[in-house]
């Protein structure tokens, strides 16, 4: 990961345009290929960002350095760096990933057992299907035999959609699996996350944890 603190302006050029005037900001260049621009507020949320894969060019023109970050759709972040206060790179290695809380782990187990909740004809291929950047919660096949990656959360937020998007990009490079569709499943899905998922062709599924636990309860089983 590369960390840069700089006085800079930022322009986004793509389907829309956006401009951030000159200010001191933190620029994050991550090993996964993402770039994000942060201010000293907004918690973890960036002012602007570019999701992977994207490419960075750092030419020097005149008095200011213009860093151009471009994704495969041709959208650009143009970062005009006026002064750099800090520039360092760090090798963080492979992260073990977030350990799911009890509810998320139970949701995963229940959905794996009752995979028909995803749709008629769905079958489970594997839980915790490993990718180079971490495990997909469930890998399934739909009624037509097509691969489906399922990410399960207790609260469905934008970060979860981004995580599933990265998994899908990698899985779709595997000719034995592609094409791979995505399902974002959670007890509660925030409107912004649902909008982003829909825009990316990812289906959203709201899970009723209490009902699913009832399905798992011996009291409700005939045998």
Curated annotation (Swiss-Prot):
- Signal peptide range: none
Q: Kindly list the GO molecular function terms attached to this UniProt entry.
A: DNA binding; single-stranded DNA endodeoxyribonuclease activity
From which domain of life does this come?
Bacteria
Q: What is its EC number?
A: 3.1.-.-
The UniProt entry, under Gene3D superfamilies, shows: 2.70.180.20, 3.40.1350.10
Q: Which UniProt keywords apply?
A: Cytoplasm, DNA-binding, Endonuclease, Hydrolase, Nuclease
Q: What is its main location?
A: cytoplasm
Name the enzyme's class: hydrolase
Q: Where in the cell is it found?
A: Cytoplasm
According to the UniProt record, one GO cellular component term is: cytoplasm
Query: What does it do?
Result: Cleaves both 3' and 5' ssDNA extremities of branched DNA structures.
Q: Which family does it belong to?
A: Belongs to the NucS endonuclease family.
Protein name as it appears in the record: Endonuclease NucS
Source organism = Mycolicibacterium vanbaalenii (strain DSM 7251 / JCM 13017 / BCRC 16820 / KCTC 9966 / NRRL B-24157 / PYR-1) (Mycobacterium vanbaalenii)
What taxonomic lineage is listed for the species of origin?
A: Bacteria, Bacillati, Actinomycetota, Actinomycetes, Mycobacteriales
């Amino acid at each position: 990961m590369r960390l840069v603190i700089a006085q800079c302006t930022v322009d986004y050029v793509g389907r829309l345009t956006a401009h951030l005037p000159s200010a001191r900001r933190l620029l994050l260049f991550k090993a996964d290929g993402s770039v994000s621009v942060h201010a000293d507020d907004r918690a973890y949320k960036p002012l602007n960002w570019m999701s992977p894969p994207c490419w960075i060019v750092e030419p020097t023109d005149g008095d200011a350095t213009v860093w151009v970050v471009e994704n495969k759709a041709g959208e650009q972040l143009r970062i005009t760096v006026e002064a750099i206060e800090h520039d360092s790179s760090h090798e963080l290695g492979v992260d073990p990933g977030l350990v799911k809380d009890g509810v998320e782990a139970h949701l995963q187990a229940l959905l794996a057992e009752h995979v028909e909740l995803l749709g008629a004809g769905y079958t489970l291929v594997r839980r915790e299907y490993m990718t180079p950047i971490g495990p997909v919660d469930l890998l399934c096949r739909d009624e037509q035999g097509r691969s489906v990656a399922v990410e399960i959360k207790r609260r469905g937020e934008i970060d979860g959609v981004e995580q599933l998007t990265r998994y899908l990009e990698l899985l779709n490079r595997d000719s034995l699996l592609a094409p791979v569709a995505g399902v974002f499943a959670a007890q509660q899905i925030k409107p912004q996350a649902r909008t982003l998922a829909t825009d990316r062709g990812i289906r959203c599924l709201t899970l009723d944890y209490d009902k699913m636990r009832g399905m798992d309860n011996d009291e409700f089983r005939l045998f």
